[in-house]
Amino acid sequence: MAGVKALVALSFSGAIGLTFLMLGCALEDYGVYWPLFVLVFHALSPIPHFIAKRATYDSDATSSACRELAYFFTTGIVVSAFGFPVILARVAVIKWGACGLVLAGNAVIFLTIQGFFLVFGRGDDFSWEQW
């Protein structure tokens, strides 16, 4: 039952993050949909982890070059997702209020993605190993 509660909490927090992102685009004062391109970064962020998990064996080694490279690529993707709205606001494509809403949405969505891997990445009875 704890896994179901975690799944509901993760879906609720993901919905909140997407709401912030949509508010940054669709409010009447902002009305520009360029910040929606951060959804590409949200979709790309777990891919290096999936590849590293498939390519390496689960050994007790403290570090793996493949896993470290996946962390590096994931960090680059996350930093790009936070930098993209700032650059758009700096060149006056979007307003700074929209940038703030998109950054808040980014924080919530990336924390949701991290929470998913913390909850379902363990390997207990209620884990989704196919993910």
UniProtKB/Swiss-Prot annotation:
Record-linked InterPro entries: Vps55/LEPROT (IPR007262)
Family: Belongs to the OB-RGRP/VPS55 family.
Membrane topology field: Multi-pass membrane protein
Function: Negatively regulates leptin receptor (LEPR) cell surface expression, and thus decreases response to leptin/LEP. Negatively regulates growth hormone (GH) receptor cell surface expression in liver. May play a role in liver resistance to GH during periods of reduced nutrient availability.
Quaternary structure, from the entry: Interacts with LEPR. Interacts with RAB13.
PANTHER family from the UniProt entry: LEPTIN RECEPTOR GENE-RELATED PROTEIN, LEPTIN RECEPTOR-RELATED
GO terms of biological process kind: negative regulation of growth hormone receptor signaling pathway; negative regulation of protein localization to cell surface; negative regulation of receptor signaling pathway via JAK-STAT
Keyword set includes Membrane: yes
Subcellular location: Golgi apparatus membrane; Endosome membrane
Cellular component terms (Gene Ontology): endosome membrane; Golgi membrane
Entry keyword set: Endosome, Golgi apparatus, Membrane, Transmembrane, Transmembrane helix
Transmembrane segments: 7-27, 32-52, 69-89, 100-120
Pfam hit, one: Vps55
Molecular function terms, GO-annotated: signaling receptor binding
Domain of life per record: Eukaryota
Name of this protein: Leptin receptor gene-related protein
